[in-house]
């Protein structure tokens, strides 16, 4: 009976020690440990990507700075009034591996550093100034304004045209109402 009591106590102590959290961890420790490992792995992956991106940016910045200083050195050696050599041309320079297929042009005679152009905001097109019209439009307007004057029956005097304009015809009057 004593032997059986010892076995029961040992089983009870074993179960209690296994299920009681050690060092403040809960019962489901292995499951949380796996989740934490996955999130930690993803964090390290993202950190590695950001470090790689930072290295790439630093490399490109350093490369551009070398090109810029090379341009400054080349222009400082040349006198300010001299013309550039006739055989200098803009040649295509390849960066990166052959499978990228990206070509960047190098302007050898350029003195100013590169400045990004501001993006154009889409908007309405600007209209021309209202005071400036093309000659053809002016002629068309003149001929249109001359039609009612020449079409009126009369002696051609200015008084006749004024009487035509001041007294509306019955057909035109019916259209207005």
UniProtKB/Swiss-Prot annotation:
- Keyword annotations for this protein? Calcium, Cleavage on pair of basic residues, Cytoplasm, Hormone, Nucleus, Secreted, Signal
Q: Where is the protein found, in the record's own terms?
A: Secreted; Cytoplasm; Nucleus
Q: Which GO terms describe its cellular component?
A: cytoplasm; extracellular region; nucleus
Query: Which stretches does UniProt call biased (Basic residues)?
Result: 122-132
Q: How is it modified after translation?
A: There are several secretory forms, including osteostatin, arising from endoproteolytic cleavage of the initial translation product. Each of these secretory forms is believed to have one or more of its own receptors that mediates the normal paracrine, autocrine and endocrine actions.
In this entry the propeptide is located at 25-34
Task: Output one GO MF annotation.
Answer: hormone activity
Q: Where is the composition biased (Basic and acidic residues)?
A: 109-118
PANTHER family listed in its UniProt record = PARATHYROID HORMONE-RELATED (PTHR17223), PARATHYROID HORMONE-RELATED PROTEIN (PTHR17223:SF0)
Annotated function: Neuroendocrine peptide which is a critical regulator of cellular and organ growth, development, migration, differentiation and survival and of epithelial calcium ion transport. Acts by binding to its receptor, PTH1R, activating G protein-coupled receptor signaling. Regulates endochondral bone development and epithelial-mesenchymal interactions during the formation of the mammary glands and teeth. Required for skeletal homeostasis. Promotes mammary mesenchyme differentiation and bud outgrowth by modulating mesenchymal cell responsiveness to BMPs.
Q: What is this protein called?
A: Parathyroid hormone-related protein
Q: Which organism is it from?
A: Oryctolagus cuniculus
